[in-house]
Amino acid sequence: MTLGVTPRQQNMFGSTVSYCGGRVPAGSIYGVLHRECFTLFPDEMFADLFTDVGRRSVPPMIVAVVMVLQRIEGCSDREAVDRFAYDARWKYAAGGLDFDYPGFVHTVLACMRARLAASTRPDRIFEVTLDAARKAGLVGRKRVLDSTPLYDAVATMDTVTLIRSGIRGLLKAAGADLEAELRSVIGRDDDYAAAGKPVCDYDDPAARKELVDALAKDAMALLRVLDGRELDEPASQSGELLATLVGQDLDEGPGGVFTIARRVAKDRVISTVDPQARHGHKTAAHGFDGYKGHISIDPDSEIITATLVTAGNTGDAASAGDLLAQDLPTQDVPATDVAGDGDSPPDQVSTAHGPDATGNETNTATEMEAPLAVYGDAAYGAGVLLEKLEAASAQIMTKVQPPVAPGGRFPKDRFTIDTGAGSVTCPADVTVPIQPDKAGGGTAAFGTACASCPLAAQCTTAKTGRTISIGRYEAQLTRARATQQDPAWRAEYRATRPKVERKIGHMMRRRHGGRRARVRGQTKVAADFSLLAAATNLARFGVLGLTRVAGPGWAVAPS
């Protein structure tokens, strides 16, 4: 398929320009795209996606405009092509096309997404909007980080459905000879052809247990057949998934009987249709299934500077380094003890979809003179991130939670922790050494000194005395807690950080394709989220009055 070209010659009597020009606000996303679509998304920008032979494609500039409007309005593919065919604003946004300009089928949008995903610059539409914002001076040296749940596009499966779907997937992925061998070891009276739950009297506990055991034995028999074999990629992936499902949800009891485990695996797969989705918690009381969408914004212009999608169980602090990859110097910081207090395990890190691969300078000389300032709520107040920001000489505006004070007793910050001297001094002026551990932290045990201490009742109820855990990043956390006691710091934090909440609200206003993912798989969800960020930036351009000018290329209209 060869590159199609967007027509620039308009029909004087049938163009949408004369009709929409006085009706569509210049500051709307339709007005912005109408004025700047040929500059932002020229057909040549997508030339690498097409060949030199074949029939002409739908002009990619038109497709890009439709994709952007589809994301901002939360349309499905079919709804989007219908809007382009019948809504004059959409043709007006695509350069002022004629009313009778032909539409196209919805599969063109899916084809364009696939071409972009297979290219070296899958997020080029977002990159273009960010580059325009930089050239207009809208991207400074402040970054506010936050995340939001993205509900997956599939149903969460229970254990029985998971195991049976895993078996079905393996049988489907296996070649004819291997499938015949696998089916020969199946013990249940089930051909595993139809999807869904197997037939069972689910009101009968004994029948449920028998079903779980039978499914588990079938799964284990299949895995034994695969053990030690060289498999092609589909069969290998299906076998690994089945082994994961059995291991995470089942326990083998006395007599080799399998039962559902009374626990939740740390990285539990929740669906065989989208194996990358995970259980997540935005707060202790708010759980969800799917992914997390992370964004970084410039708080002064409210332009989104970076996006990232991770599994739902990934911590916010673990993703911050990827969000700030274009702003922080490259450095190697071990991703251990993410919480930094010695009590929490490291979060699972996901791959970022970086914001800028256009080849343009990401920071002007003026921007580089100012230190980077990073804002975030307490989810970003982790030691590993604080260390990275300190190493980059960044201004740390991420909130750090105060130490826990069980039962109203002395919190950790009442103790003087001297990591240099390797000692801890309690409020009663008793000093004990820190016993280091392999993770880089340690513990300080006061032991028998607490027995005769007059402050013991205010400090601990443990018979063995108070013990203080020292995390690897204790010094960074202590400095951050001290800094955020400054009233000026608090005023700046309260005035700046909430802006990212409003931006997330703008992105999530449409449930379809906003809060609810339209596609399956982390890579596709990330590409969709990046496109949503691009559409949100374009809408912001209209509010700011961004226009094309000579010289730097872009400027904000004077207010």
PLM regions: where:
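A short glycine/serine-rich beta->alpha loop
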Residues: 49-56, 519-522
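Alpha-helix boundary/capping segments in eukaryotic regulatory proteins
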Residues: 73-81
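Double-stranded DNA-binding cores of transcription factors and transposases
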Residues: 3, 60-61
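DNA-recognition alpha helix
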Residues: 80-92
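Basic, low-complexity segments
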Residues: 1-53
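Anion-binding and metal-coordination hotspots
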Residues: 79, 97-98, 102, 107-559
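Alpha-helical support elements that line or immediately flank enzyme active sites
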Residues: 62-74
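Function-dense linear segments that define catalytic or interfacial modules
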Residues: 37-44, 73, 296-300
